[in-house]
Every structure is written in C-alpha cells, then in structure tokens.
Amino acid sequence: KHYEQAGANIVVYTGGTGLSNRDVTPEALAPLLDRNIPGMEEAIRSYGQERTPYSMLSRSIVGVINETLVLGLPGSTNGAKESMDAIFPAALHVFQILRGGGH
C-alpha cells in the first residue's frame, strides 16, 4: 500500500502471468483489487492474439484499488509493451471515471 501513500495513479507488475507453478501474479493481485476490469484484460489478450497464438495462455490481470489502476502484465518485454499498446490511451479514461467524471 506504499503506492497509495505516494499518490500513484497506476501500478504495473510484470511477470508471473503464465501457466507454470511459479506464475502466481493473478492469484496474488486478485484479492487486493476492489474491482477487476475484464474488458481491459480481454483487450490485452485479443491484441496479443493477433500477433502470437500463445497470448491466449496469458493470465494478465487488470483492476483498481481505490483510485489506482493496477496492471499485471506478461514478463517479456514485448508482451508487456504490446499489452500497454492494447489498452492505452483508452485506459486513461479510467482515471476520469474513478475521480467521479462521466462515462
């Protein structure tokens, strides 16, 4: 929760979203999230699927804790970059909504 005290708008975790026994990022983050954002998770997988068939195996997780956007993305540099490409700049609208702005 240090990020909250620092006033972070976004926290990005990379790695641990695959299927091996040590890939536990989604399980670690899920109980901490106030709400998931399944549409952003779907956008990440869909965007990746256009580039590699293995993206369907990714378990990226997206949600919010209070007014902070939390992203659990693939650990590979390319996977993380493509995930960010998939959701930005549209993800910026999340901050407007969290601060009481319109949809």
Please provide the spans of the model-predicted regions.
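Non-catalytic beta/alpha edge segments that cap or flank active sites
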Residues: 1-103
